[in-house]
Amino acid sequence: MSRIGKQPIPVPSGVEVKLGADVVEVKGPKGSLTTPVSPLLKYEIQDGSVVITRVEETKKASAQHGLRRTLLANCIEGVSKGFSKVLEVNGVGYKVAVKGNNIELALGFSHPVVIELPKGIEAAAAGNKLTISGFDKQLVGEVAANIRRVRPPEPYKGKGVKYEHEQIRRKAGKSGGKK
């Protein structure tokens, strides 16, 4: 039995869960999300929580059990509380600015890099920190990863874009002596 999958998902007040034939729709104060349903699982709403059980005991059903439960729990948490990721921009002259629906990054290139935010994602810049927030956990993570990919942190000085609590493996510079 999947230890994650067998846990019921509590549905907070203000969140509505609709079980469909091929998708589960979740509506809340922050927005609306859908997640696909696996035919190997059975979804039920009991006592203000969603319970997912397996139809058959196979290895694939066991894998789907934990996955689908976590995806649905992320949808429920997203439409009620939302998710956010914080990025840090380190480097001399490196700047980040939010202009409307775009993020403008000055990261040492000859031109500013402009990244357009998808629908449902918000950004806020404060100093060298950039906060990406939204109700879809996968989309928040994808946008943050795309921003980090523009200039990932380098191991010698640590310059670049990194996640807030990310540890950069540093390398020693040249250690050759003079002749």
Swiss-Prot record:
GO terms for molecular function: rRNA binding; structural constituent of ribosome. One of its GO terms (cellular component) is cytosolic large ribosomal subunit. It comes from the Bacteria. Gene3D superfamilies: Ribosomal protein L6, alpha-beta domain (3.90.930.12). InterPro entries: Ribosomal_uL6-like (IPR000702), Ribosomal_uL6-like_a/b-dom_sf (IPR036789), Ribosomal_uL6_a/b-dom (IPR020040), Ribosomal_uL6_bac-type (IPR019906), Ribosomal_uL6_CS (IPR002358). The keyword Calcium does not apply. Keywords: Ribonucleoprotein, Ribosomal protein, RNA-binding, rRNA-binding. Residues 154-169 have a biased composition (Basic and acidic residues). Residues 170-179 have a biased composition (Basic residues). GO terms for biological process: cytoplasmic translation. Pfam families: Ribosomal_L6. Residues 154-179 are annotated as: Disordered. Part of the 50S ribosomal subunit. Belongs to the universal ribosomal protein uL6 family. This protein binds to the 23S rRNA, and is important in its secondary structure. It is located near the subunit interface in the base of the L7/L12 stalk, and near the tRNA binding site of the peptidyltransferase center. This is Large ribosomal subunit protein uL6. It comes from Oleidesulfovibrio alaskensis (strain ATCC BAA-1058 / DSM 17464 / G20) (Desulfovibrio alaskensis). The lineage of its organism: Bacteria, Pseudomonadati, Thermodesulfobacteriota, Desulfovibrionia, Desulfovibrionales. The gene is rplF.
